[in-house]
Structures are given as C-alpha cells and as structure tokens.
C-alpha cells in the first residue's frame, strides 16, 4: 500500500514540473487500488484553496480559485482516502507523547500510514524520517 503525502499530491497537479513526471512514472507501476491519500491531506488541500479564495481581491482571481477548488474536488473523486480512525489516533497519541518534532498534521499522516502498514511517498524526508518505524520514500529525486 502506497500513501501519497500532501506535498506530492499538490505536485501532481503541476504537470509541467519534472518532479511531477518522476512521481507519475513511479505511480504507473502500481494498481490504482494500491495508491491512497489521507483525509488529513484532503483537509490541508481544502483549507489551502478556501484560504486562497477568501484572500482574492478580484473577480478573476475568485474565478481561478473556485476553478482550482473544483478541480481539486474532482481529483479526489477518483482517489482512495484513508481515514483518521481510532487506530491512527492511538498511534498519533503515542507519537505525540514521544515528543517527535514533526508538525501535527504530518504526525497524523504518519499515524495513518503506520496504522495501515503502508509506505509514505513524500519530498519531506527530513521530518518524516524522525518517525520511528515509518517507511518513507521520495520518488521525485
């Protein structure tokens, strides 16, 4: 099972970047039912687009923002999303108690990945490698 971190999900929306191409090449090796996002990534991306829209100063910027929000929602229609369930919450509490210096949202993503015995695909190796027993890979290098 592969879980794509928020940073890589965002990168997949930017097809013109070489990192996006590298990520897609790796993803093609897996069946669609082996690739997941997390509800935490959904929340992070949703908050990002809503924040963008709130800050828009022009109608044209709003049109762009709502268009991107719509595209984001459409992309998740075909995405399997792992929940932040009780097993993940228990792991999250344990990791918090260990005082691992990783942001709360990243720690929740790590907990979901650990609860599902998955591999996390991210560019943020410096943070996620601090999480004990978490399998992480960067497919953009």
For every predicted segment, state its role.
Residues 47-53, 75-121:
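Active-site neighborhoods of divalent-metal-dependent phosphate/nucleic-acid chemistry enzymes
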Residues 25-29, 73, 81, 110, ...:
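Short secondary-structure boundary/capping segments
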Residues 8, 41, 88, 109, ...:
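Alpha-helix capping/helix-boundary segments
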Residues 1, 110, 114-141:
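Acidic, PIN/NYN-like endoribonuclease modules and their adjacent C-terminal/linker elements
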Residues 39-40, 85, 124, 140:
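Residues at the C-termini of beta-strands that transition into short coil/loop
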Residues 1-40, 51-70:
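Short, well-structured N-terminal submotif of metal-dependent ribonuclease cores
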Residues 13-16, 49, 96, 132, ...:
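Short, flexible helix/strand-to-coil boundary loops that buttress conserved ligand/catalytic motifs
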């Amino acid at each position: 099972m592969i879980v794509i971190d928020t940073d890589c999900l965002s990168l997949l929306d930017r097809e013109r970047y070489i990192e996006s191409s590298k990520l897609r090449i790796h993803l093609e090796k897996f069946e669609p039912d082996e690739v997941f996002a997390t509800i935490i990534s959904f929340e992070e991306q949703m908050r990002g687009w809503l924040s963008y829209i709130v800050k828009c100063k022009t109608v044209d910027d709003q049109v762009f923002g709502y268009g991107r929000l719509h595209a984001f929602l459409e992309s998740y229609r075909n995405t399997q999303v792992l929940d932040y369930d009780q097993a993940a919450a228990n792991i999250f509490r344990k990791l918090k108690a260990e005082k691992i210096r990783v942001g709360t949202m990243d720690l929740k993503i790590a907990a979901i990945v650990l609860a599902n015995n998955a591999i996390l695909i991210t560019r943020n190796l410096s943070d996620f490698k601090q999480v004990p027993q978490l399998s992480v890979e960067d497919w953009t290098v």
